[in-house]
C-alpha cells in the first residue's frame, strides 16, 4: 500500500502478484514469509488474510487499473471465503487457525475490526466487477453487531487486550462505530491513551 501511495504502481502490482502466487488452496497465507520461504507455519491469521481486499481496493482507487482488479479477484474471493469460514454463530471471527488448520478458538477486537473494513473493501471490488457477494455484507453486519454488543465473544482465553489503544481506536478507524457513537468511544478513554503534543500510546 505504501508503494501505491508513493506512485510505485508497477512495484505494488508485482507485490500483489507475489501474494497471489503464495496463496494456499483454502485462500489463506501463513503468518509470515521470507522471500518464497514460509517463516512461520504455526498459524494463519484471519485479519492478515482478509486485508488483501483492503490492499487491492486501495491500489485500484489510486491506479484506476481495472485489469489489475479483475486479475486479483480470484485471490480476494478465496481469501474472504477462508475468513468467513471462521465466523461463529455469534458473529465474531476467530483470529487464526493453527498449523493443521484448526481454529484457535478466540477472537480479537482489533483483528475483527480490521476484517470489518476488509469486508467493505471486498464487497466494493465485487460490485465494481459485477460479482454477487451480498452475503459478505450480511457477514459484515453480523461482525459489526458482535463488536458493538457482544464483548463477551472476545478475549475469552487470554487477558483482555482492552488495555491496548488499538482495541480502543481501531473499531472507530474501521467504521464499526460512526458518528456520535464513534465520538463517544474516543472521548471515553482519550485521556488514558493520548499524550498531548506527542500522540497516541
Regions found by a protein language model. Give the residues of each.
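Acidic/His metal-coordination segments adjacent to aromatic residues that form catalytic metal sites
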Residues: 29-42, 93-107
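Aromatic-rich carbohydrate-recognition surfaces in CAZymes
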Residues: 1-88, 112, 116
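Acidic side chains
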Residues: 47-48, 65, 94, 98, ...
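Extended ligand-binding clefts on enzyme/binding-domain cores
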Residues: 71-74, 78-80, 84-95, 102-117, ...
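A near-ubiquitous, low-amplitude feature marking generic local secondary-structure context
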Residues: 2, 35, 66, 98, ...
Amino acid at each position: 500500500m505504501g508503494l501505491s501511495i508513493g506512485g510505485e504502481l508497477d512495484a505494488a502490482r508485482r507485490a500483489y502478484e507475489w501474494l497471489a502466487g503464495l496463496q494456499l488452496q483454502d485462500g489463506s497465507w501463513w503468518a509470515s514469509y521470507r522471500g518464497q520461504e514460509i517463516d512461520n507455519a504455526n498459524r494463519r491469521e484471519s485479519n492478515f488474510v482478509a486485508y488483501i481486499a483492503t490492499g487491492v481496493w486501495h491500489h485500484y482507487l489510486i491506479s484506476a487499473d481495472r485489469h489489475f482488479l479483475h486479475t486479483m479477484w480470484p485471490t480476494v474471493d478465496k481469501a474472504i471465503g477462508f475468513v468467513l469460514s471462521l465466523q461463529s454463530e455469534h458473529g465474531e471471527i476467530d483470529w487464526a487457525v493453527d498449523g493443521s488448520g484448526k481454529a484457535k478458538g478466540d477472537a480479537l477486537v482489533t483483528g475483527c475490526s480490521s476484517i470489518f473494513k476488509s469486508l467493505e473493501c471486498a464487497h466494493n471490488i465485487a460490485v465494481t466487477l459485477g460479482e454477487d457477494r451480498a452475503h459478505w455484507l450480511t457477514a459484515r453486519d453480523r461482525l459489526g453487531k458482535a463488536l458493538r454488543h457482544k464483548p463477551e465473544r472476545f478475549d475469552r482465553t487470554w487477558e483482555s487486550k482492552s488495555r491496548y489503544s488499538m482495541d480502543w481506536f481501531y473499531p472507530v478507524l474501521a467504521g464499526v462505530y460512526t458518528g456520535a457513537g464513534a465520538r463517544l468511544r474516543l472521548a471515553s478513554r482519550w485521556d488514558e491513551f493520548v499524550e498531548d503534543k506527542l500522540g497516541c500510546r
